[in-house]
């Protein structure tokens, strides 16, 4: 009730926002001490549901609802929101920086893979970018690329991108190359290829096409999602997800991003998760209602 007194319902022309930092930390409640429930990346368009003090309740493209502090978001009217991107690119290096000039005199901000950049110009080997809050930065051309058309990539591309993150630490709520949880990892890998999939493993399992629930590994293709969990009170509970990379192996964010095997005789065998294996699903070519193109 104390919080309720501070809630502002925003006028229609101010219900749009774009993430302004390399990583926007999303909280379960409007407080920095609240649990980190997820993250979203620079350039992501969000819908603002309400304002409470210096916090905004937002809805991300994958329909995840959470709180972000005012420093992580730029508020726009509908016209500027829809017309913000002149040329939309994605940051494709794992981590890096935008600079105030092509001479790299000082850093404007850090950048992480998956950041969506608004390219407004070019100079030699650099692109000029504009941030949602109107800051200007310069980024090396080799570090960014046009956003993929989701029809143009294969499971092998998913695997190639997933391996870039080997060794990245586990972070509950993490969806960036600074730290991942299991579903944040799978979500980010697919985002790199222009597909927005749901945030949590329990949501991701509802998308795509079922390809295996009998441990028949020959049914799987590179890039398929593997789901793990347990049954309680007759209900299925999904608590982990990984990516099949072929040859009996999968890649996952568990302790850190690492490769494991489905075969007990393999030194990389992950007994804990394999005892909880539920099923595998194929996203590529089977984009169901919960999957969106970037």
Features from the language model and the residues they span:
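Boundary regions of SH3-family modules and the immediately adjacent low-complexity/disordered segments
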Residues: 1-15, 31, 52, 60-94, ...
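Short alpha-helix capping/helix-loop boundary micro-motifs
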Residues: 30-35, 97-107, 206-216
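Aromatic- and glycine-rich peptidoglycan recognition patches
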Residues: 74-76, 82, 100, 104-106, ...
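Catalytic cysteine-centered active-site loop
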Residues: 170-184, 188-222
């Amino acid at each position: 009730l104390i919080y309720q007194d501070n809630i502002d319902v925003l006028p229609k022309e101010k219900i749009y926002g774009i993430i302004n930092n390399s990583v926007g930390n999303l909280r379960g409640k409007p407080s920095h001490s609240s649990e980190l429930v997820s993250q979203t990346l620079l350039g992501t368009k969000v819908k603002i549901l309400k304002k409470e003090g210096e916090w905004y309740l937002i809805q991300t493209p994958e329909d995840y609802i959470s709180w972000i502090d005012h420093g992580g978001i730029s508020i726009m009217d509908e016209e500027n929101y829809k017309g913000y991107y002149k040329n939309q690119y994605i940051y494709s290096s794992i981590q890096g920086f935008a600079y105030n000039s092509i001479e790299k005199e000082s850093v404007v901000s850090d950048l992480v893979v998956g950041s969506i950049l608004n390219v407004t110009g070019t100079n030699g080997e650099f692109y000029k970018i504009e941030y949602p809050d109107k800051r200007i930065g310069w980024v090396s051309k080799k570090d960014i690329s046009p956003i993929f058309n989701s029809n143009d990539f294969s499971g092998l591309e998913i695997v190639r991108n997933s391996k870039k993150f080997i060794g990245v630490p586990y972070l509950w709520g993490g969806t960036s190359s600074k730290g991942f949880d299991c579903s944040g990892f799978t979500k980010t890998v697919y985002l790199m290829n222009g597909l927005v999939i749901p945030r949590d493993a329990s949501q991701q399992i509802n998308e795509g096409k079922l390809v295996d629930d009998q441990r028949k590994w020959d049914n799987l293709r590179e890039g398929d999602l593997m789901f793990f969990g347990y049954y309680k009170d007759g209900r299925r509970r999904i608590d982990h997800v990984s990516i099949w990379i072929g040859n009996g192996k999968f890649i996952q964010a568990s302790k850190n991003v690492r490769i494991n095997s489905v075969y007990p005789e393999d030194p990389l065998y992950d007994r804990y998760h394999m005892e909880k294996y539920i099923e595998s699903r194929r996203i590529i070519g089977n984009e169901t209602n919960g999957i969106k193109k970037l």
